Curated annotation (Swiss-Prot):
Lipid bilayer topology: Multi-pass membrane protein
This protein's GO CC annotations: plasma membrane
Subcellular location: Cell membrane
Keywords noted in UniProt: Cell membrane, Membrane, Plasmid, Transmembrane, Transmembrane helix, Transport
Entry protein name: Putative tartrate transporter
TM segment ranges: 34-54, 64-84, 99-119, 130-150, 156-176, 194-214, 259-279, 292-312, 336-356, 367-387, 414-434
Pfam families linked: MFS_1
Family to which the UniProt record says this protein belongs: Belongs to the major facilitator superfamily. Phthalate permease family.
Superkingdom in the source lineage: Bacteria
Molecular function via GO: transmembrane transporter activity
Length: 449
């Protein structure tokens, strides 16, 4: 086994030692086949979702948008996302990941490109809403898809690898977006128009690639040997059967109080994530920097977030502990936002944004490992989509409140404190959920061999 493969498999073992040759071989194959590709998909998804933050550096002035108008427009994406999330994930569960994820990517690529032709407030709101509709189902669809392939005791680690694409999107996408903004005037288009057009293209291309590359279920994986395929199918079926009292119906997934609790936890983390993604460029630019300088500075927090996320998820899987891994990360992010509210220099802002990015990124893998511990089948599709759709409304509330408070007070300070408060509430709700339903959030028993 090559050294890089051993290092990757270390993420999936409690003690870092691969003891089962068949398990090791299967995990290696499905990890290298699936994870890098879905990371690339999420990289593009997150970039197209938050590149509006860079567009705002000149678009707001070009189109006469106030901070309130921009905040609402940036956040209204999540209203469309909310309304169509559950239906989209149920369709994915019915028709298969390959076809539905391809549809999602192609339609969001088209709408993302159309953002280059925004003329005013109305078209801005409509296209951002439609982008949310188009992208609905992608993220929870991937979470559901991973639950078809990876055992629960390994899922936080693989989820961390997938989710690392978000901070990586900031690391690589920020300088790219900043550079594209400098294309202002080329062929009569503004820099922000070029940015939308160019960054929409990968989604269209990858949407077609998905049709030929993704495999819906382990049973159809011709790239596994018969022995490997049988082991994986048997393992995943045994895990699902072993849930015993797990909820299976769509209504069970929608009505489960634990689903609602996790959705509210995710609401706070989403508010923090998209406040960071959408407003960070303007928070940095207020110190008099160019678009390219903003891009490079905005990339730095993501570097630390990628490393921290993978290590944090590895520790969560190794210990089988989820609750405090979510709580601690939320508290760290809240502290970072409070620090950012009082920052008086670019260096202080950079430190604060790094703390926020690390905290929010670390909260996600253990959080998203929880719902599939008590949901399966159609209930998992509905429950995961419900958590994501309700939770992502935080992506509307956070950025919108930041814009309104900035217009009202002339400062980002109050808005940053507001979002920090939401993250504090997320931490408290996680503790309440763990106390009332410990089996829903911990995997210690699954990790005992």
């Amino acid at each position: 086994m090559q050294a890089q493969e051993v290092r990757l498999l270390y993420l999936f073992r409690e003690d870092g030692v691969v003891t089962n040759d068949l398990e090791a071989r299967v995990l290696r194959k499905i990890t290298f086949r699936i994870v890098p590709f879905i990371m690339l998909l999420y990289f593009i998804a997150f970039l197209d979702r938050v590149n509006i933050g860079f567009a705002a550096l000149t678009m707001n002035q070009d189109l006469g948008f106030s901070s309130t108008v921009f905040g609402i427009g940036a956040g209204i994406f999540f209203v469309g996302y909310f309304l169509f999330e559950v239906p989209s994930n149920l369709i994915l569960n019915k028709v298969g990941a390959r076809i539905w994820i391809a549809r999602v990517m192609i339609t969001w690529g088209i709408v993302s490109g159309l953002m280059a032709f925004v003329q005013g407030t109305t078209s801005f709101y409509i296209l951002r809403f439609l982008l949310g509709v188009a992208e609905a189902g992608f993220f929870p669809g991937i979470i559901l898809y991973l639950s078809f392939w990876f055992p629960a005791r390994r899922r936080a680690a693989v989820t961390a690898l997938f989710m690392a694409a978000a901070p990586l999107s900031t690391v690589l996408g920020s300088p790219i977006s900043g550079a594209l903004m400098e294309m202002h005037g080329l062929m009569g288009l503004a820099g922000w128009q070029w940015m939308f057009l160019i960054e929409a293209a990968p989604a269209l291309i990858l949407g077609v690639v998905v049709l030929f590359f993704l495999t819906d279920r382990p049973e159809k994986a011709k790239w596994l040997t018969e022995e490997e395929r049988n082991w994986l199918v048997k393992t995943m079926n045994a895990e699902q059967a072993g849930r015993g009292t797990a909820s299976h119906s769509v209504m069970a997934g929608l009505a489960d109080i634990r689903v609602i609790a996790l959705a509210l936890v995710y609401f706070g983390t989403s508010a923090g994530l998209y406040t960071l993604g959408i407003w960070a460029p303007q928070i940095i630019k207020q110190f008099g920097l160019s678009a390219i300088e903003v891009g490079f500075i905005n990339a730095v927090p993501g570097i630390f977030a990628v490393v921290a996320m993978v290590l944090w998820a590895r520790h969560s899987d190794r210990t089988g502990e989820r609750t405090w891994h979510v709580v601690g990360a939320c508290l760290l992010a809240a502290a970072g936002l409070a620090f950012a509210a009082g920052a008086t220099s670019v260096f202080m802002v950079l430190i604060a944004l790094t703390i926020v990015n690390v905290g929010i990124s670390c909260s996600k893998p253990p959080l998203w490992s929880m719902p599939t511990m008590f949901l399966s089948g159609p209930a998992a599709a509905a429950g995961i989509a419900t958590i994501n759709s309700i939770g992502n409304l935080g992506g509307f509330v956070g950025p919108s409140m930041i814009g309104w408070i900035k217009d009202t007070t002339g400062s980002f300070t109050g808005g940053l404190y507001f979002v920090a408060g939401l993250l504090l509430i997320s931490a408290i709700l996680t503790l309440i959920l763990a106390r009332s339903s410990p089996k829903a959030v911990e995997t210690r028993t699954a990790n005992q061999h």
